[in-house]
């Protein structure tokens, strides 16, 4: 039989105090909704339907054509949200997973186990449950003396006795699809919230003598539903530990994993060493045997094998094998550094390609440049690329030596094997094999300093 999935993503999330829909808040680099969608993929659903409501267009942009969408214009409860999927799913034979879009920690493995449990026990409904010593706020699982599930009672509707129950409802279920939509026609709003509860379907199945079961999570953390910023931070912390543990198992060394922040889609090869306070974001890829020292920040970039990045920022760029960067360097978007390039302290590179074995040791700005191989930039070199309106390109050939404190004003080209004298301002092309000197000639005026007020003779 087929599997189907319903993701509930219509809520506003008032307690988040945000203009952004709750399910779009990010955990480890992607939205909570994307985490849930990826986990749902483990059951290989034939159809996935996402229920949207508050700022539906923003939610739909995230999953685009990966799912079908239905709109819940009024948020009248989880049961009402599932009713909205009736035009797509009613009458289909199979098993339907219902899951909230604000549960980013649920794993695909747990959802697959839930479906298998449901099928193997021939249940008409199976509840994903968890156990906790602090069940406040959760719906409780009420069982009879034979441990059979009788019903789910919400916190606001629970008796004092029921509030002592430690087994809680995670808000995730599997139903026989046809029976689900038949039962939904019989639920009502006679409860403290005045809403249609999906949990009332469980009571209906029990009344008709149909089999209802519960599968208990092994890890309570997976049950976390995010309703405010506190829970969001908790989810981030748990996810970070999972991610770092995965990388350590795969051969990556962490000096302090609790102080290292790695997004879920980051790829790291074995033998990489990561010091504390390193942040790796987006689609970043790190090659084998690279070292990332304290304070390094990398986003959406590729770093090759054997590189050393020291307390520096790299954004949307590529760094080849054996490159050294930093400390205190900034590689800005759309830059590429060839093999064995050295970018030293207080060097900024923006929108530039730099050939292999080129060195910019300190205090240099390289912007909108095409730089060849074996180039040396002296300290204080500035490429001037902006005239206040337009940006221009500088082309520097192979084996060029640029003396310290030079200013290269684009658009200009320095030919292969050329040399720029220290302190020069270059405004014209420099031919290959030429030396360019663009500075004022030094003049010494003997004894002139004795006329100045700061001279010891005048004190």
From Swiss-Prot:
| Cofactor(s) the protein requires to work | Mg(2+)
GO terms in the biological process aspect are: cell morphogenesis; cell wall organization; lipid A biosynthetic process; peptidoglycan biosynthetic process; regulation of cell shape; UDP-N-acetylglucosamine biosynthetic process
> Does the entry feature the keyword Transit peptide, yes or no?
no
List the catalytic residues.
362 (proton acceptor)
Catalysed reaction equations from the record: alpha-D-glucosamine 1-phosphate + acetyl-CoA = N-acetyl-alpha-D-glucosamine 1-phosphate + CoA + H(+); N-acetyl-alpha-D-glucosamine 1-phosphate + UTP + H(+) = UDP-N-acetyl-alpha-D-glucosamine + diphosphate
Q: Which Pfam families match?
A: Hexapep_2, NTP_transferase
Q: Name one GO molecular function term.
A: magnesium ion binding
> Which residues lie within the region annotated Linker?
230-250
Where is this protein localized, as stated in its record?
Cytoplasm
Q: What is its EC number?
A: 2.7.7.23, 2.3.1.157
- UniProt record similarity statement: In the N-terminal section; belongs to the N-acetylglucosamine-1-phosphate uridyltransferase family.
Q: Which NCBIfam families match?
A: glmU, PRK14354.1
Q: Please give the function described in this protein's UniProt entry.
A: Catalyzes the last two sequential reactions in the de novo biosynthetic pathway for UDP-N-acetylglucosamine (UDP-GlcNAc). The C-terminal domain catalyzes the transfer of acetyl group from acetyl coenzyme A to glucosamine-1-phosphate (GlcN-1-P) to produce N-acetylglucosamine-1-phosphate (GlcNAc-1-P), which is converted into UDP-GlcNAc by the transfer of uridine 5-monophosphate (from uridine 5-triphosphate), a reaction catalyzed by the N-terminal domain.
Q: How does it assemble?
A: Homotrimer.
What is the protein name stated in its UniProt record? Bifunctional protein GlmU
Q: Which organism is it from?
A: Streptococcus pneumoniae (strain ATCC BAA-255 / R6)
């Amino acid at each position: 039989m087929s599997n189907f999935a319903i993701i509930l993503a219509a809520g506003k999330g008032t307690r988040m105090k945000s203009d952004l829909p709750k399910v779009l808040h990010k955990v480890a680099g992607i939205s909570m909704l994307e985490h849930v969608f990826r986990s749902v993929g483990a059951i290989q659903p034939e159809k996935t339907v996402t229920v949207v409501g508050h700022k539906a267009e923003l939610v739909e942009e995230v999953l685009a054509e990966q799912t079908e969408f239905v709109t819940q214009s009024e948020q009248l409860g989880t049961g009402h949200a599932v009713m909205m999927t009736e035009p797509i799913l009613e009458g289909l034979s199979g098993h339907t997973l219902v899951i909230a879009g604000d549960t980013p920690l649920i794993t695909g493995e747990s959802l697959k186990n839930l479906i298998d449990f449901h099928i193997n026990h021939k249940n008409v409904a199976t509840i994903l449950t968890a156990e906790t010593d602090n069940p406040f706020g959760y719906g409780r699982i009420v069982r009879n003396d034979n441990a059979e599930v009788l019903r789910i009672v919400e916190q606001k509707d629970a008796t004092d006795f029921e509030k002592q129950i430690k087994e809680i409802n995670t808000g995730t279920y599997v139903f026989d699809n046809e029976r689900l939509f038949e039962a939904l026609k019989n639920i009502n709003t006679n409860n403290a919230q005045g809403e249609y509860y999906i949990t009332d379907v469980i009571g209906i199945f029990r009344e008709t003598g149909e089999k209802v079961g519960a599968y208990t999570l092994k890890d309570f953390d997976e049950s976390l539903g995010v309703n405010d910023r506190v829970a969001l931070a908790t989810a981030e912390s748990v996810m970070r530990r999972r991610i770092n543990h995965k990388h350590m198992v795969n051969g990556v060394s962490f000096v302090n994993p609790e102080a290292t922040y790695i997004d879920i889609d980051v790829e790291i090869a074995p033998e990489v060493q990561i010091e504390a306070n390193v942040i790796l974001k987006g689609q970043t890829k790190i090659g084998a045997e690279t070292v990332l020292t304290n304070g390094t920040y990398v986003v959406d970039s590729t770093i090759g094998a054997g590189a050393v990045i020291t307390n520096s920022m790299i954004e949307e760029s590529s760094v080849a094998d054996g490159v050294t960067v930093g400390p205190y360097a900034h590689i800005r978007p759309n830059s590429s550094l060839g093999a064995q390039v050295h970018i030293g302290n207080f060097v900024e590179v923006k929108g530039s390609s730099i050939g292999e074995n080129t060195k910019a040791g300190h205090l240099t700005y390289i912007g909108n440049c095409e730089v060849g191989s074996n180039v040396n930039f002296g300290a204080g070199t500035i490429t001037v690329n902006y005239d206040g309106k337009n940006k221009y390109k500088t082309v520097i050939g192979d084996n060029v030596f640029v003396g310290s404190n030079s200013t290269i004003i684009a658009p200009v080209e320095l030919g292969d094997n050329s040399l720029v004298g220290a302190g020069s301002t270059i405004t014209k092309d420099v031919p290959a094999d030429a030396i360019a000197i663009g500075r004022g000639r030094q003049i010494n005026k003997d004894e002139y300093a004795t006329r100045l007020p700061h001279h010891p003779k005048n004190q």
